[in-house]
Amino acid sequence: MQPVCQILDECRIERQTILFSATLDDEVADLVRDYQTNPVTIEVGPKEVSMDSMTHYFWLMPNSKKSTITSEIVRKCGRTIVFCRTRAGADRVGDDLTHDGLAAQVLHGGLSQKQRDRAMARFQHGECMALIATDVAARGIDVEGVNCVIHYDPPENGKAYKHRSGRTARGGSSGIIISLIQKPQRKTVSKIQREVGINVEFTPPDFAQLPEFEVEFIGAPRRRSFGSRNRNESSRKHYGNRNRPQ
């Protein structure tokens, strides 16, 4: 927020200030208090994301299984947004999904605006099955028809959990939220559950729990191969029906 404050400090005192924000958090409230006089607030949409319109799963697994299980979820659920903590993590998951044959796009602050716009356009137009994003880059995403949100890495707090999860269950529809949890993270994630007002058991992955979606498989573009990644596809364990085209 510091650059915004610096700009406002250079503006003349007698002015009209109109503030637009995708979220009304404490930082935005500080801006309103410090730089606006008797402001009128206009909010569009519900004041708070409803956790009741979503089905939440908290799956326990080792870190080594997260990539494979993410691919299986995308094949089962279709249009999915995957949230990662870091840019490098998002790139890695995007590469893993692509090498698993899934069309995926990555969205984070390390990309140019043109690259981010292209990734969003492909996801919005149904040209890929998964969008892998960091929290900052995903602010303001409003895409209809997202069936599932995956917390590949746990969010920082309950507020971030709500914000991420709210990318699905838009416009009164339902949504699936799946958190991929390692045992040492249980205490932190339990605190997040309390903050958002849910109480969900930690379980092993169970694809039979997931609802059936009409999924249109979108494969990754074929690339010329100049070497091997040493990935033995036939030896990998699958956790559900992958809905591969026959």
Give the predicted meaning of each segment:
Residues R222-Q246:
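Intrinsically disordered, low-complexity RNA-associated tracts
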Residues M1-P221, R244:
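Conserved helicase RecA-like core
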